[in-house]
């Protein structure tokens, strides 16, 4: 059974606290916009599609509870008053993680719905209901998109390997970075969804994944997802990618994305660029799998993508259960560096240039570069 990042029931929202995984499964209830913002900011929930879903759902919850109030809040006095209240709420949610374009796409979509409903002359109650429905739709649409892009990418990759005369009798060996499965989305996943699809169709031999320091999304989250799904897998340290390519038959690297520029430059979890450079050296296809909402056509290239800088202390700490242990799941956080370091560089993301990317997959299909081109035309897949 696949893991889930968000579960809802009526007006109740709960997220799995990913900071405690894989050793403790704890659901945290989200009751306010501020709690949703904090959960995203502190990475209790992460993954571009998942944080967009949580933001949209918490916004729907905010309005749903407002409609249940008696009397209605003062900002329901007029459409203009409602707009003046809601626009700052959406802007605040967007500040939680600025690099992930899905979050911005969700807040812009809700803003568009707000303005359209006002322009149609609807009552404040009807405007609020439109926004509630739109917020829920943003989250609900994610799973279908993920399954579509996973099939597009999986079939394309398998056909490419076969057409190139590659050995895939036992299935494909695929490396991924970070965590892009059900924990990073509303379900199934993007790059990890592609791996899951290959496994489900008998076309996967083994999945490989990097630990993805300093937050260890690979060793904590991807490891747990693959184990839960019974997908054969091997973990490697981030610094072992080159060695893996030298000694094993790896057919592709598949990664997700937090933002894709118009030309195909892709921002993803730190360490992605390293893997792309080494993959190019070994002529291994490098594939980005992400929903259309991750493509930001307003950004010309990766140079214009803002890169979130995480607190320096996060690069100095690791969390896990005590080892050896007596069977309990008591966790500890320890510092692995000396105190008082002169400096710590801790970006959450890096940008892989389009020239290093073989294909970009969305729910609409697979985009490849033209002959001799170093940039993508993403028009057919957005």
Curated annotation (Swiss-Prot):
Top enzyme class: isomerase
GO biological process, one term: L-methionine salvage from methylthioadenosine
Catalytic activity from the UniProt record: 5-(methylsulfanyl)-alpha-D-ribose 1-phosphate = 5-(methylsulfanyl)-D-ribulose 1-phosphate
Subcellular location: Cytoplasm; Nucleus
Active site: 258
Pathway: Amino-acid biosynthesis; L-methionine biosynthesis via salvage pathway; L-methionine from S-methyl-5-thio-alpha-D-ribose 1-phosphate: step 1/6
Family according to the record: Belongs to the eIF-2B alpha/beta/delta subunits family. MtnA subfamily.
Functional note: Catalyzes the interconversion of methylthioribose-1-phosphate (MTR-1-P) into methylthioribulose-1-phosphate (MTRu-1-P).
Name of this protein: Methylthioribose-1-phosphate isomerase
Native source species: Laccaria bicolor (strain S238N-H82 / ATCC MYA-4686)
Gene: MRI1
């Amino acid at each position: 059974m696949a893991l889930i990042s968000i579960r809802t029931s009526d007006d109740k929202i709960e997220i799995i606290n990913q900071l405690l995984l894989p050793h403790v499964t704890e659901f945290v209830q989200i009751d306010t916009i501020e709690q949703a913002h904090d959960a995203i900011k502190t990475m209790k929930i992460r993954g571009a599609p998942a944080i967009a879903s949580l933001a949209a759902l918490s916004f729907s919850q905010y309005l749903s509870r407002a409609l249940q109030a008696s009397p209605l809040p003062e900002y329901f006095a007029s459409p203009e008053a409602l707009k003046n209240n809601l626009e700052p709420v959406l802007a605040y949610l967007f500040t939680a993680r600025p690099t992930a374009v899905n979050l911005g796409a969700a807040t812009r979509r809700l803003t568009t719905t707000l303005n359209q409903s006002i322009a149609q002359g609807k009552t404040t109650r009807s405007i609020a209901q439109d926004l509630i429905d739109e917020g829920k739709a943003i989250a609900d649409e994610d799973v279908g998109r993920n399954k579509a892009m996973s099939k597009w990418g999986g079939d394309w990759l398998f056909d490419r390997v076969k057409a190139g005369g590659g050995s895939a009798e036992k299935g494909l060996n695929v490396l991924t970075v970070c965590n892009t499965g059900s924990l990073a989305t509303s379900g199934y996943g993007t790059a990890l969804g592609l791996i899951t699809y290959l496994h489900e169709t008998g076309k996967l031999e083994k999945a490989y994944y990097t630990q993805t320091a300093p937050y260890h999304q690979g060793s904590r989250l991807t490891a747990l997802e693959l184990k839960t799904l019974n997908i054969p897998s091997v973990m490697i340290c981030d610094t072992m990618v080159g060695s893996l390519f030298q000694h094993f038959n790896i057919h592709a690297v598949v990664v997700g994305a937090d933002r894709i520029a118009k030309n195909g430059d892709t921002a993803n979890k730190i360490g992605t660029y390293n893997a792309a450079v080494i993959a190019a050296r070994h002529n291994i296809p490098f594939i980005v799998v992400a929903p259309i909402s991750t493509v930001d056509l307003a950004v010309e290239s990766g140079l214009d993508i803002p890169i979130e800088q995480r607190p320096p202390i996060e690069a100095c700490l690791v969390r896990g259960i005590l080892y050896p242990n007596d069977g309990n799941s008591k966790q500890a956080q320890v510092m692995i560096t000396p105190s008082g370091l002169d400096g710590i560089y801790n970006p959450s993301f890096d940008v892989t240039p389009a020239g290093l990317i073989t294909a970009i997959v969305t729910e609409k299909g697979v985009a490849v570069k033209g002959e001799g081109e170093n940039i993508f035309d993403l028009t057919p897949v957005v």
